[in-house]
Amino acid sequence: MTQPIRDSLGRPLRDLRISVTDRCNMRCRYCMPREIFGPNFTFLPRSELLTFEEITRIAAAFIRAGVRKIRLTGGEPLLRADLPRLVAMLADLPDVHDLALTTNGSLLARYARPLRDAGLRRVTVSLDTLNPATFSRLADTDIPLDNVLAGIDAAQSAGFFPIKLNAVIRRGVNDGDVEELAAFARDNGHIMRFIEYMDVGNSNGWRAADVVPAAEIIARISSHWPIDPLPPRYPGEVANRFRYRDGRGEFGVIASITQPFCRDCTRLRLSAVGEVFTCLFAVRGHDLRSIVRSNTDSAAIDAALDEAITRIWSRRSDRYSELRALDSDGSREDADESEASAVPGRSTHPGHRKVEMSYIGG
C-alpha cells in the first residue's frame, strides 16, 4: 500500500474533498449571503469547470499519493448535471476506501437511489433546524424544509446508513434547536454533528460572540440524555463523538473554534476549476487544471500531477485555527510574525482574503 506523503508538520495526506460546482440553490447566511451572491454574481462558466474525466484523473493522482477517502461537495453538488456518472467513475478507482457526498438535501429525493447504485457509500446532509420558519430564514430560500427531510428519508431508503446530519449552530439564530435536532437524529437512526460557527471566507459577517461553544452543546445534550465519550475511529477525525448510554446512537461536535484540530488535519480541497487548497481558510490555491489540459502525452501529465501534489503537500505548514486561538487568548506575543504572515488565510494581515467556502466546499 502506498504510504501517504507528509507535510512540514508531519501530517499525512489521506482525504480529498472535491468541489464539483460553485453554485447553490440556497443562500445560507454563513456560506453564501444573498447580498453578495445575488442575481448579478458571476459564477464559474461551464468551460472552466473540470470535466468528470479530469476530476477522475486528478483523483487518481491523489490516490497514488496516499488518499483513501474522497468526498464530493459544492456549492450544492447535486446541481452538477449527471453527477452519478462521476460517482461511478470515482468508485471504479482502486484503493478508494470511502466515497461520500455532502449536500443540502433539497435534491436528494431525486438522486439518492442513482447515487447509491453508482457506488456512493455515504451521505451527509446539512440540517441546521427543524423549524420551517427558521430554516427559510437561515437558508434564505423558498425551498421548503420538507424537501430536505424527504431527501433524508429517500437516502435512508436507498441504503445509506447511518446518515450524518450537519448543523452549524449560531447564537441567537438556531441555538435553541440543539435538543430537537439531537432527538430527531436519535429517533431516526441518524448521526447528528453540531458544528461551531466558523470564520470561513470573508462574506459571512462572522463574530466570536455568535459562536456556541461545543462544550455548551455537549452539556445541554447530556442534561437530557446520559452520554459517554467515544474514541476516534481513525487518526485525524474532526468530530468529538459521544454515545447515548441508552443505546440510541451517537452524536458529534466539531469544535474548530474552541478546540482547533489543525495538528491532525489530513485534508486537501480541490475546487471545481482545479485549484488545490491545503486549508479551508486558505488565501490562494495551486493550479492543477493547466496540467491536465496541457498538450502532452498521458504519462507526462500523470508524472506532472504526481510531482505537483507531492510538492504542494510536503510544503504545507498552515494551521489557521490554532493561530486564531492563540491570538484570541494572547498566547502569541512571542510568536514568529513571519510564520503568521506565511500561513494562508491569516485575515489579521492586510490584503489577505480567504477563499469562500462555496468555492472549495466545507
UniProtKB/Swiss-Prot annotation:
Pathway assignment: Cofactor biosynthesis; molybdopterin biosynthesis
Example GO molecular function: cyclic pyranopterin monophosphate synthase activity
Residues holding GTP: 17, 71, 102, 164, 267-269
Cofactor(s) this protein requires: [4Fe-4S] cluster
Binding of [4Fe-4S] cluster 1, residues: 24, 28, 31
Binding site for S-adenosyl-L-methionine: 30, 75, 126, 198
Protein's UniProt name: GTP 3',8-cyclase
Classification lineage: Bacteria, Bacillati, Actinomycetota, Actinomycetes, Acidothermales
